[in-house]
Amino acid sequence: MTRQSFDAIVIGGGLVGAAIAYGLQRQGLATLLLDEGDIAFRASRGNFGLVWVQSKGLGAPHYQRWTRGSAQEWPKLAAELKERTGIGTGLQQPGGVHLCLSEEEFGKRGEYMARLQREAGNFGLEYRMVRGAEARDMLPGLGPQVVGMSWTPYDGHASPLYLLRALHTGFTGAGGTYQPNARVEGSSAAPNDFSVEAAGQRYRAPRVVLAAGLGNADLAPRFGLEAPVRPERGQILVTERTQTVLPMPTTTIRQTEEGSLMLGDSKEDAGFNLGQSPEVMRKIAQRAVLSFPWIANLNLVRAWSALRVMAPDGLPIYDQSERFPGAFTANCHSGVTLAGTHANRLAPMIAAGALEPGMAPFSARRFNVRSAA
């Protein structure tokens, strides 16, 4: 007989939902993970794979701390998943760089990083602006167009697909229930008493977590929540495999464990259009070749686009329902970077029944001017 009662239901089987479900199950909560399947706009399959700190949180120190915290949690999460599942996530954290192709870019980047450091306050932020011979010692093969770069020791990268597989395997291995092809067809909400209809079944739990990416916009009001998220298209190019040549990732280029180079970082307002633009692809390739001219000798073997989950201010939304306690929402566009905090910090809060006070700046109420005032 199919189990229908759980301690928690997580809606959304991508990187965000899987990390939270894994964390809840590890906390001892019998958790159901509902995954809509391939009809969903799968942001996870298009994730670039950076574990990135240095470009996050300008004007939002709480987000900078949350991101740094996740980078710190990542080694523990990766080691635990490897031990429990035998699946490596490909995590490497050698630091990372943002390349600047003009003096103007370098100057603006220096100002950006200095402001991030000031906003970090006592929390601190270690970074360096690197030029010339030192930059080329750190990254052999840099092109003459590269004026310099910013570096921080916190950054790294991992495989989004290996991570997703490890989280799912770790979740079910710990006793979690995974239901694929389970689009939410109906629901009801009362304080600490929720029911969800999916895959022809009705499930109940005192906690429900909305982690369905762009689908949260429609789901949230059913549970007394708001998720004003919109799609932002990003495109990625992938080269053939080559010898290991990049000792650390950049904002727009990283080398996978298998040897391929991933090139990306486009940001497009294209609605829900998952198509690809030759002009955008040309710009991605052009910047990559200006950064490392030897990339021009590699063949491109794959290209795709995916939709990021973006709030109006670009920051994550984490919220709990005042009307229906026990209902939570998690929305972000950094499912790989934030996997550490989602599994190791956010999930324990949800298990305890409430978000910690320090999470208040992430609430969607920040978009309601009257409430924020």
Please place each PLM-identified region on the residue numbering.
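Helix-loop-beta segment of a Rossmann-like dinucleotide-binding subdomain
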Residues: 87-101, 126-174, 266-270, 325-332
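Helical element adjacent to the flavin cofactor pocket in flavoenzyme catalytic cores
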Residues: 150-206, 215
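N-terminal Rossmann-like FAD-binding beta1-loop-alpha1 element of flavoenzymes
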Residues: 6-33
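Dinucleotide-binding Rossmann-like beta1-alpha1 core, especially the glycine-rich loop
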Residues: 49-134, 138, 287-289
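Short, well-ordered coil/turn residues at beta-beta hairpins
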Residues: 12, 198, 211-212
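Active-site substrate-recognition segment that forms the wall
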Residues: 19-26, 36, 47-51, 86-92, ...
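C-terminal catalytic lobe of FAD-dependent flavoproteins
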Residues: 292-373
